């Protein structure tokens, strides 16, 4: 693409527009600058709310992939890629999902997480190669993230995923975007021009983070990773998380602290198993069998056998 064509394209992208409410921001004192930023941030939640129907469709697609043994793959460049990685890596400790069930890809690879990699976002071949390296298949769901909706790395990945017959989702902040037109599901949070023109790490990045939170969290709830609003599949891999696991067992069962510790010890720190043991009186093996029979849904396992 020539520079003239690129300039023309950028002029048509909502996230690249100038914000008339912040034209004087460089003349303002600190508090007034912060108030301008905060005023713009208030628009983000409403923009995400307006995209709720498409976010719902995205969750349903991800749940379908998980139920078929597939994966959730995030793909982006720069801030968008880092947000995908951030969401992906938190799924293992929060929900004890297997490594590789939720994956974040960033243009330029691991180096690009902390350093800018020149030209990476324009590399269409890399977008395809990164998915091929994962043995991406029709069981998986690809979420392409780009505030502008035009990033070549992401667009190429979405096109390849469609060739694989996988479900594709675009997360962007620009109506009628390139990636939105490629993807099966177009999640577009129309946050408007940024406080600083084109700095999409601001409102656009915040909107993307909220959307990714929804996609992963709702999907995990739908596959039985929670009980009530408790993280009962928490991986108690450090002292803080173990203390949280104890609290979760106590909150779910109304038991004493010592009872929670003992149950977790017998259950090898498996929170669901410990809760089921306390509430139903079964032993460790029976608790695991009940959970397996109900595909890991604690609520269903607790009601098993009741009439």
From Swiss-Prot:
Catalytic activity: N-acetyl-D-muramate 6-phosphate + H2O = N-acetyl-D-glucosamine 6-phosphate + (R)-lactate
An example molecular function term from Gene Ontology annotations: carbon-oxygen lyase activity
EC number: 4.2.1.126
Record-level GO BP terms: 1,6-anhydro-N-acetyl-beta-muramic acid catabolic process; amino sugar catabolic process; N-acetylmuramic acid catabolic process; peptidoglycan turnover
Chain ranges of the SIS domain: 62-225
Active site, renumbered: 90 (proton donor), 121
Stretches that traverse the bilayer: none
SUPFAM superfamilies listed in its UniProt record: SIS domain
Entry keyword Lyase: yes
Keyword hit for Ribonucleoprotein: no
Alphabetized InterPro entries for the sequence: Etherase_MurQ, Glucokinase_regulatory_CS, MURQ/GCKR, SIS_dom, SIS_dom_sf
UniProt pathway: Amino-sugar metabolism; 1,6-anhydro-N-acetylmuramate degradation; Amino-sugar metabolism; N-acetylmuramate degradation; Cell wall biogenesis; peptidoglycan recycling
Keywords: Carbohydrate metabolism, Lyase
Main function: Specifically catalyzes the cleavage of the D-lactyl ether substituent of MurNAc 6-phosphate, producing GlcNAc 6-phosphate and D-lactate. Together with AnmK, is also required for the utilization of anhydro-N-acetylmuramic acid (anhMurNAc) either imported from the medium or derived from its own cell wall murein, and thus plays a role in cell wall recycling.
Subunit and interaction comment: Homodimer.
Family: Belongs to the GCKR-like family. MurNAc-6-P etherase subfamily.
NCBIfam families: N-acetylmuramic acid 6-phosphate etherase, PRK05441.1, PRK12570.1
Further comment: A lyase-type mechanism (elimination/hydration) is suggested for the cleavage of the lactyl ether bond of MurNAc 6-phosphate, with the formation of an alpha,beta-unsaturated aldehyde intermediate with (E)-stereochemistry, followed by the syn addition of water to give product.
Name of this chain's protein: N-acetylmuramic acid 6-phosphate etherase
Organism: Pseudoalteromonas atlantica (strain T6c / ATCC BAA-1087)
């Amino acid at each position: 693409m020539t520079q003239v064509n690129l300039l023309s394209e950028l002029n048509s992208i909502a996230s690249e527009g100038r914000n008339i409410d912040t034209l004087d921001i460089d003349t303002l004192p600190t508090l007034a600058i912060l108030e301008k930023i905060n005023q713009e941030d208030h628009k983000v939640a409403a923009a995400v709310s307006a995209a709720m129907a498409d976010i719902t469709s995205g969750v349903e697609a991800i749940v379908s992939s998980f139920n078929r043994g597939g994966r959730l793959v995030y793909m982006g460049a720069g801030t968008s890629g880092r947000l995908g990685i951030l969401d992906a890596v938190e799924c293992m400790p929060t929900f004890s999902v297997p490594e590789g069930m939720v994956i974040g890809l960033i243009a330029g690879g691991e180096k690009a997480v902390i350093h800018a990699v020149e030209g990476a976002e324009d590399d269409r071949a890399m977008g395809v190669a990164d998915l091929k390296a994962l043995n991406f298949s029709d069981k998986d769901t690809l979420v392409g993230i780009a505030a502008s909706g035009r990033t070549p790395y992401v667009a190429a990945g979405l096109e390849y995923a469609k060739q694989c017959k996988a479900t594709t989702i675009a997360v962007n902040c620009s109506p009628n975007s390139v990636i939105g037109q490629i993807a099966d599901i177009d999640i577009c949070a129309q946050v408007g021009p940024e406080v600083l023109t084109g700095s999409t790490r601001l409102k656009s990045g915040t909107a993307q983070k909220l959307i990714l939170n929804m996609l992963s969290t709702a999907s995990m709830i739908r596959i039985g990773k929670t009980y009530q609003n408790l993280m009962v599949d928490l991986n108690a891999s450090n002292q803080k998380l173990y203390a949280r696991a104890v609290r979760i067992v106590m909150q779910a069962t109304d038991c004493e602290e010592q009872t929670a510790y003992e149950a977790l010890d017998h259950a090898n720190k498996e929170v669901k198993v410990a809760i089921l043991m306390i509430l139903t009186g079964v032993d460790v093996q029976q608790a695991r069998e009940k959970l397996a029979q109900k595909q890991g849904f604690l609520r269903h396992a607790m009601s098993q056998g009741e009439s």
